[in-house]
A protein has these predicted regions:
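N-terminal cofactor/phosphate-binding cores enriched in small/glycine residues
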Residues: 8, 12-83, 94-100, 115-120
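Structural signature of hydrophobic alpha-helical transmembrane segments
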Residues: 27-42, 76-93, 134-140, 380, ...
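Transmembrane helix-loop junctions at the membrane interface of multipass transporters and ion channels
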Residues: 110-134, 469-486
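Generic detector of multi-pass transmembrane helix bundles and their immediately adjacent loops
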Residues: 430-571, 580
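C-terminal ends of transmembrane helices
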Residues: 45-57, 98-105, 399-407, 445-454
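Core alpha-helical transmembrane segments of integral membrane proteins
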Residues: 31-32, 346-447, 466
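Long, hydrophobic alpha-helical segments that serve as membrane-spanning/inserting helices
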Residues: 1-15, 22, 26, 30, ...
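Alpha-helical membrane-inserting segments
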Residues: 23-31, 47-48, 72-80, 94-102, ...
Length: 696
């Protein structure tokens, strides 16, 4: 029971965040310095945004960099304000200088908002203490935060990685069960595919997250890390075999009518799903896996495959389920590979700076957008005669997310949560609760807020707002005066963030659909080249297969976000949704062909070359249709003719069947692209006649 309690992701996270906040407050209370203990609670907010609690092989180096940036921003803010430098100029300078961190890598990019938040917190402290005290608070607070989290992760043994792996296994279980419960509904892809696409998207996102965590811990050679690496390799093998499909609805229907294949296949899928859920709990709660057998289910599937040798569905399901059963039974990967062959080196500073100084740099545009929003927020504070507009600035910084949909959702949750929290705090302040009870209620509220933070940001904001009001009440006895101004500041900050997201160099996902579709086709082409090569090796095959899945996932995410964006052509998105559906079919065929190529089930060289040329022509036709507008107005561009595969004598092998279906899907995607292009917008990035002109 205690394992399920202490290792539960939400409980473990809430305990860690609450303790790192409240232990300094408790120490300050015992030493008679409650004020400094409460001020220490500002530092974990900056560290969380910077991702300094991420387990990493350079954990302490990142702590030193984070503490240095926090202290430097705090010092510059105080010194420049003392020299009467306007706040908009100060914030613009800090934002544009720190924006280069986004070019170094996604983890480094988190240092920009965290450092700006440290500067904004300094605005609230300036005038109440000497210049050196905020610097000391940030330095000691970051040191405490790092040491506590290092000790916590040392006790719980890679718990964040275990949580991600557990979620991955659980998502694979749901995906496997959902896929084969819709076995007889595959004749209607519009109904059967959307839920499967969502689950496939979640699984690939979790695989990417797990890989990043494995890479950040790659310097460790302890037994626990090696065990997690093996479990991750098993998950990759399971995803490879679960996400394949022949896409032969007619053959499926024939097999279902002639036998009880539907019940047997569903029996296998449910058994596999149940085992995956057990393994997910074992990973999360630090339990050793128990023995597992699936011989009866696999035997029944093998019997159906023998009874119907002319139907490829039975053979296909038996082969892939037997591989899944082997992984689950032996608890070992199907083959050896080097998962960390790609070292993912960060970009050196000088090349990153050169890339950042380009006007087409997304990092520069993001920094420019943020600097304008913060400048407008500070000017708004001046216009309203606010002595310090730090709450407006903080609101803008916290609600601004990567994309229109995420920002809009965060604005709604933040504004509603703040309003409710301020109302509750305003009522509670009238009761004049003693200090001891106040601190106890703040502790309980903080723990409850972190418990629900991951699932409901709005309700968590209610709790954080209440604790913020009482923190000000304990520090400066002005909690009641704080309520109405902070309510107005929150609304102003949310409006500024929304306006900046919509009007300041917006990065609409709808405008990236062409580029992402082009990149996905390029990944498919590289994968097919590797599969049809003379001697494909397991590690390059595994890497390319994941590139294919991630490229399609990026395209699918762009489509989902584009559907939430305002004032976009719904006809174009409907056509692109059908295009993405066929792209998913190709991904599943590539997953299946990867397993065949790894086991050296290759085609004859002449036939392989012929199929490779046909696939490349079909892919390039799709890319050209995405790149140019009309066949007659493409200038010197050559729109290629459709490939015509000559039928070969004898029954086509499994690999050849997959290739034929890939070519069929590509031809359909070319037709869809021709129809979708006529529905495209006629403004902004869409005025570019060629895709390569807009790739930046």
């Amino acid at each position: 029971m205690w394992r399920r309690l202490i290792y539960h992701p939400d409980i473990n996270y809430a305990l860690r965040q609450t303790l790192v906040l409240c232990l300094p407050v408790a120490v300050g209370l015992m030493l008679g310095e409650l004020r400094f203990g409460l001020l220490f609670s500002l530092v974990p907010a900056c560290c969380n945004i910077a991702g300094l609690d991420t387990p990493h092989k350079r954990f302490f180096k990142r702590l030193i960099i984070g503490a240095s940036l926090f202290a430097t921003c705090s010092l510059l803010t105080q010194l420049l304000l003392a020299k009467d430098v306007p706040l908009p100029f100060l914030l613009t300078g800090l934002t544009l200088v720190l924006g280069v961190t986004a070019e170094l890598g996604p983890l480094h990019a988190k240092l920009l908002p965290a450092s700006l938040l440290a500067a904004i917190f300094t605005l609230s402290l300036a005038g109440y203490m000497p210049v050196w005290e905020p610097l000391l608070i940030y330095a000691l607070g970051t040191l405490w935060y790092g040491l506590f989290n290092w000790f916590w992760f040392w006790i719980w043994r890679e718990q964040p990685l275990r949580e991600s792996l557990s979620l991955l296994y659980r998502e694979l279980a749901d995906y496997c069960e959902a896929k084969y419960s819709l076995l007889t509904q595959h004749t209607d892809p519009e109904k059967a595919l959307p839920p499967l696409l969502v689950r496939q998207q979640k699984a690939v996102d979790l695989i990417t997250q797990c890989y990043q965590q494995m890479h950040m811990l790659s310097a460790q050679n302890n037994t626990d890390y090696k065990r997690m690496l093996r479990i991750f390799q098993e998950a990759l093998d399971l995803q490879e075999h679960i996400s394949v499909s022949l896409h032969q609805p007619e053959e499926v229907q024939k097999l279902v009518e002639r036998s009880h294949a539907e019940e047997v296949i569903r029996w296998n899928a449910q058994t596999v799903a149940a085992r995956l859920r057990v393994l997910a709990d074992d990973i999360l709660y630090h339990r050793l896996p128990t023995r597992f057998t699936i011989e009866k289910q696999i035997g029944a599937l093998e019997k159906i495959a023998r009874q119907h040798p002319d139907n490829p569905v039975g053979q296909f399901c038996y082969w892939h389920f037997s591989r899944i059963a082997r992984v689950l039974r032996t608890q070992k990967p199907l083959y050896a590979r080097d998962l960390l062959a790609d070292k993912q080196r960060r970009m050196p500073l000088l090349p990153a700076l050169k890339s950042y100084l380009s006007l087409k740099s997304p990092a520069l545009r993001n920094a420019g957008r943020l600097s304008v929003m913060l400048s407008v927020a500070s000017l708004m504070g001046t216009a309203l005669h606010l002595p310090k507009s730090y709450w407006i600035l903080m609101t803008v910084l916290l609600v601004t997310q990567n994309g229109y949909g995420a920002t809009r959702l965060r604005i709604v949750n933040r504004s509603v949560g703040t309003v409710v929290g301020l109302i509750i705090a305003g009522v509670a302040l009238h009761f004049k609760i003693p200090e001891g009870y106040t601190l106890t209620l703040m502790l309980i509220t903080t723990l409850a807020s972190y418990l629900i933070l991951r699932k409901n940001y709005g309700w968590a904001t209610v709790g954080f707002t209440i604790t913020a009001v009482y923190t000000l009440q304990l520090l400066w006895l002005n909690g009641e005066q704080y309520i109405l101004p902070r309510l107005i500041d929150t609304i102003i900050g949310c409006l500024i963030a929304f306006g900046g997201t919509v009007w300041l160099w917006p990065q609409w996902q709808s405008g990236l659909l062409r580029k992402n579709a082009h990149d996905a086709l390029e990944a498919y082409q590289d994968a097919i080249r590797l599969i049809l090569s003379e001697d494909p090796q397991p590690t390059p095959l595994a890497w390319q297969r994941m590139r294919v899945n991630q490229a399609h996932n990026t395209l699918y995410n762009s489509l989902n976000q584009a559907m939430q964006e305002p004032a976009f052509n719904s006809h174009y998105l409907a056509d692109m949704k059908l295009w993405v559906t066929h792209s998913q079919f190709i991904v599943e065929h590539i997953n299946a062909m990867t397993t065949l190529a790894r086991e050296h089930r290759a085609l004859p060289p002449e036939l392989a070359q012929e199929y490779l040329q046909s696939c490349e022509i079909a892919i390039q036709r799709c890319q050209q249709r995405l790149e140019y507008d009309e066949p007659g107005s493409s200038g010197d561009a050559n729109i290629m003719d459709a490939p015509e595969m000559q039928p070969h004598e004898g029954a086509a092998g499994t690999l050849e069947q997959h290739l034929q279906r890939v070519i069929g899907h590509l031809n359909t995607m070319h037709t869809i692209s021709s129809m979708a292009w006529r529905q495209r917008p006629h403004h902004g990035i869409w005025l570019s006649r060629k895709l390569r002109d807009s790739k930046a």
